[in-house]
């Protein structure tokens, strides 16, 4: 009897090993998904090397990347003409423009087969500003509460161990920090004194001279002057929770937050999926922000999405800064 149980157990292990080999080396797209998702995380890049060599990883990343539009944002293209209409170009345009009189924002549910999340339309971009944490350990809800923010999303990437924001941070037209590095392409993402979303690869001095008021450094840039970036494969950042900031030509700002890692049944989204959503809602300029467990949306001091990080559901990471609406 003991021998039979042992035989069954060994057979089970063999079956598991064979199944793993088939998944890792035979199932289409598993390699791309595993490598790109692993290397885009803050702490688990080494996962990619569990199954694949450095040569495999390099090849996959070469074939999965974002080719950004090589243009400066045309700041004068933003018109700030976004009155309600009697007819709309699409159901998505209607979702944005059909709102209550005097509304500051509108929350729109995003639901597709493999992912879900939220889009917030901000009708007065002059109410958007960058808020910073007072100390390492403050969550988005804590930042929003101290700032009396109506809407808030996460912004910069950051050093997980020490909490400082990666890359340049501009607030009130001054460079307030410049630590670490930005490894996701893009550049400075922020608003000018005229409340236009500016995306620029220039340094802080150049950006401020052009009117940059508040900004963080991240990317990639997904849309510039209405032209979407070219996405090779899945874009090189895999499938995960995402946060995006965008602006339509009519001046309306879009905060997009997509859940991932199985939260609420949402697997997450890649760069192709983000551009699909942004194009539907007529984003004219758009940039990816920090994602993964950092992707968080708070409205009126209530956590709206389901951030899933190292400690499970609805666990908010401490953040260095946030985009808020006051």
Model-derived regions: residue spans:
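Structural recognition of the beta-strand scaffold that forms the well-ordered cores
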Residues: 121, 150-154, 189-190, 197-198, ...
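Extracytoplasmic
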Residues: 115-117, 146-148, 184, 217, ...
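Active-site-adjacent helix-turn-beta-strand microarchitecture at beta-sheet edges
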Residues: 158-235
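Conserved, well-ordered active-site substructure
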Residues: 163-181, 231-284, 289, 294-326
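Conserved hydrophobic/aromatic beta-strand scaffold that supports enzyme active sites
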Residues: 117-121, 188, 221, 244, ...
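Short acidic-glycine loop/turn motifs at beta-strand connectors
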Residues: 122-124, 190-196, 225, 247-251, ...
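Zymogen propeptides
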Residues: 2-180
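Short, solvent-exposed aromatic-acidic interface loops
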Residues: 134-137, 203-207, 258-263
């Amino acid at each position: 009897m003991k021998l039979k149980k042992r035989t069954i157990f060994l057979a089970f292990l063999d079956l598991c090993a064979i199944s793993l080999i088939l998944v890792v080396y035979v199932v289409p797209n598993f390699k791309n998904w595993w490598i790109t998702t692993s290397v885009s995380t803050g702490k688990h890049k080494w996962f990619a090397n569990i199954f694949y060599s450095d040569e495999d990883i390099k090849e996959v990343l070469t074939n999965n990347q974002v080719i950004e539009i090589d243009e400066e944002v045309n700041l004068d293209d933003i018109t700030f003409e976004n009155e309600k209409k009697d007819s709309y170009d699409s159901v998505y345009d209607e979702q944005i423009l059909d709102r209550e009189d005097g509304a500051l924002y509108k929350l729109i549910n995003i639901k597709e087969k493999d992912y879900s999340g939220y889009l917030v339309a901000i009708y007065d971009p002059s109410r958007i500003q960058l808020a910073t944490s007072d100390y390492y350990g403050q969550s988005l809800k804590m930042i929003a509460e101290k700032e009396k923010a109506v809407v808030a999303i996460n912004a910069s990437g950051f050093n997980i161990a020490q909490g400082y924001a990666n890359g340049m941070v501009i607030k009130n037209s001054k460079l307030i920090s410049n630590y670490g590095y930005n490894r996701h392409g893009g550049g400075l993402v922020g608003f000018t004194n005229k409340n236009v979303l500016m995306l620029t690869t220039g340094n802080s001095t150049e950006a401020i001279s052009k009117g940059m008021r508040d900004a963080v450094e991240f990317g990639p840039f997904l849309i510039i002057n209405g032209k979407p970036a070219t996405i090779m494969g899945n874009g090189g950042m895999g499938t995960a929770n995402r946060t995006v900031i965008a602006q339509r030509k009519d001046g309306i700002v879009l905060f997009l937050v997509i859940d991932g890692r199985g939260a609420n049944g949402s697997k997450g989204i890649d760069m192709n999926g983000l551009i699909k959503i942004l194009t539907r809602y007529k984003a004219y300029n758009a940039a990816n922000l920090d994602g993964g467990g950092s992707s968080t949306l708070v409205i009126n001091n209530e956590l709206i999405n389901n951030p899933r990080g190292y400690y499970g559901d609805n666990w908010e990471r401490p953040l260095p800064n946030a985009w808020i609406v006051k």
